Amino acid sequence: MLFRSPERFWTDRGRGAPARFRHAPEDIARIERLAGQFRLAAHSVGLAFGGSAFLDVAHARELSAWAERYGCEWVSEHLPGVVEGHDHATDAGLAAWNDDLLSTLTEQVEIAQDILGAPLLLENREDSGRGAAVAATRSAFLDALTQTTGCRLLLDLHNLHLDTVNRGIDGDAFIDRLDLDSIEEIHIGAGDCFVGGRVDTSDDGFPEGVWRLLQRIAPRCRKLRCVTFEFPASRDRALDHDAVLAQIERARSIVGVPTARH
């Protein structure tokens, strides 16, 4: 699967705003063409799980309507998203993996799943903690969340790679402790280097660390439905067609999918 980020088909102006949800007609026409040719999944950034004590039900219902309209096979969203003073500013911060957050997320995820009417996959974000203990804490947290709610996981391998490079977190230990049967989608992407670390922008070639993680984990994910190549819309003109195809074929060979004809 290819994912172009950001891909916005509607805008949420926030709670209490008149005509809160604004649709983009030109983008709707494009997604309708795609829906006639491909199986689709919805990837959201607006539910802001964990950002407050209450789920934004209106936003979840709007997302559900879109998923139903285009027959999306599942809906994915990011975890965690700490929001202070803004409804959907999911990059405002990162939450701690503790019982309070687990309780909040369990309630929100269960409500969201009832509204969405489609399987819900939750994506790992770059962690805010440091050190070896984080891997064990986070894997136990995610296992508890999936077992309690029945939701599944979208494992972003570049975010996991960022944890290793920027935070000193043992990605291998996280994988070894995690229930891999909960993983139904994997994201692979790239990022920018900066002094002392990397940032998650998906702009350049995939780092070898991402490929190593994919090779290590994909064959062990018995319920994996797809691997998604994530790239930003800002790079549309800069993408090298042959290089993209080469990366896709490398991913196919690791996952065990037959090589496509071009």
Language-model segment annotations:
Residues 55-153:
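Active-site acidic/histidine proton-transfer and metal-coordination neighborhood
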Residues 6-26, 48-58, 128-136, 161-168, ...:
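Acidic-and-aromatic substrate-binding clefts and catalytic sites of carbohydrate-active enzymes
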Residues 1-2:
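Short, small-residue-biased leader/transition segments that mark boundaries at the very start
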Residues 37-41, 72-76, 119-123, 152-154, ...:
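Structural preference for beta-strand elements that scaffold enzyme active sites
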Residues 12-25, 93-102, 163-223, 238:
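Gly/Pro-rich active-site loop or hairpin
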Residues 5-8, 45-48, 79-80, 125-127, ...:
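Active-site beta-loop-alpha junctions enriched in small/polar residues
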Residues 22-42, 58-73, 110-115, 144-148, ...:
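Acidic (Asp/Glu)-rich catalytic clusters
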Residues 238-261:
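C-terminal helical cap(s) of enzyme catalytic domains, especially alpha/beta-barrels
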